[in-house]
Design a protein with these regions (language model features):
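Ribosome-associated RNA-binding proteins
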Residues: 1-171
């Protein structure tokens, strides 16, 4: 009958959900519209920093769109997880984050085919944190945050299984 008390500073939380589409030219505009439609947020276009001659990428060229959701994301996250059947590989989980890709946005429940967008996929990254992370990130009076405050892959898997009923397979 005695419940194990958890230190409130050790609780795992979701910090943000990042949706990303990588494309160039017209595909980038379609990806931009897709992210706007999915998230009801304002996507930002990403510019390349390095030259990659084999891909015809030069510095300053817009190569993708990204939107970060910090509030009101649990409903969208549940839909995105359902699109992948709530089953993931353990390799997709790393320290402090969990990433997966969706091949076609029409797999997401509630999303219908948009003729002006066509068929597109997107990448989803879920970033985790513990309370007190801001101490290491702030600009004034920055402090050190110990390694214990990082969220391990096993803790992420446990959190996702308890709160979102996901299954992780593999080693």
């Amino acid at each position: 009958m005695t419940e194990e008390k958890i230190n409130p500073m050790q609780k795992v939380k979701i910090e943000k959900v990042v949706l990303n589409v990588g494309a160039i030219g017209d595909e980038l505009d379609k990806g931009f519209r897709l992210l706007k439609l999915l998230s009801n947020g304002k996507p930002a276009k990403m510019k390349s920093k390095k030259r990659i001659p084999t891909l015809n990428v030069r510095p300053g060229l817009e190569v993708g769109a990204v939107v970060t959701l910090r509030k009101n994301f649990p409903e969208l996250l549940k839909k995105l997880l359902i699109a992948e059947n709530n089953t993931f590989r353990k390799k997709q989980v790393s320290e402090n984050n969990f990433s997966f890709g969706i091949k076609e946005y029409i797999e997401i429940p509630g999303m219908e085919y948009q003729r002006d967008i066509g068929i597109m996929g997107l990448d989803v990254t879920v970033v985790f944190k513990r309370t007190g992370r801001r101490v290491g990130l702030r600009k004034i009076k920055r402090g050190k945050v110990s390694k214990r405050q990082r969220v391990s892959p096993s803790e992420i898997i446990k959190f996702m299984e308890e709160n979102f009923q996901t299954k992780f397979i593999g080693k």
